Amino acid sequence: RLVGHEIADLNHLTHLIQGAMEKNSSAKAAVEIAIYDLWGQLYNAPLYRLLGGGDPVITTDITISVDYIDKMVADSMAAVERGFESLKIKVGKDIGVDIERVKAIYAAVEGRALLRLDANQGWTAKQAVYALQTLEDAGVRLELVEQPVKAHDLDGMKYITERVHTPVMADESVFGPMEVIELIRMRAADIVNIKLMKTGGLSNAIRIADIAAIYGVDCMIGCMLEGSISVAAAVHLAVAKSHAITKIDLDGPSLCAFNPVDG
């Protein structure tokens, strides 16, 4: 369906890509990234410039995977020594252990790195409120908590958002523009996580960032376990939409044993 169309007709091309099939967002993202790359080559300019961006310097966090508490503390301290100033701590299995591991990591890196929690839908709404209030009462200051409850549970997200000081971020709850509109309408989260592999590429990611900016909702740009090409596309988006995308979680390539592609 794309053969024979001009690369300059970008909006029409992305419309065709998004309408080509249901779901399959990663496949759509791969094709869109290639199209946007050709668009940049057509005008001999980096993508972030064509999208209106300025300073091309951003800083990512690094993920600390779930493990024994001592191992997570050691991994966190090693990440800080490598220069990372934001750590994304995986939680969401055992609520009591989660609280203790976060306290231990916070004590080890306080003043040197910010902590973000990612529960990966692992808590109930009441568990999340209990854990976050317990940490807040203990003096643990968190930058955010990511997707504490199941993706479909917007009422649970709203319940948490209304009861804790820690900003709540939606990840799996938001795949496209319609979900972010509903999330904002319900006031069910403070931050939205954009991932190109969820949105089906750059076109919907741009729409999400623009919608969020209109309503004063911050965004994070995130990734799956991805190689350098898709993460590079996300970097261009982050630079172009830096007024909306204020947090960066693009550590995917650093978590891969090797880069499967060149380019």
Name each region found by the language model.
Residues 8, 12, 22, 26, ...:
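Conserved active-site and cofactor/substrate-binding residues in soluble primary-metabolism enzymes
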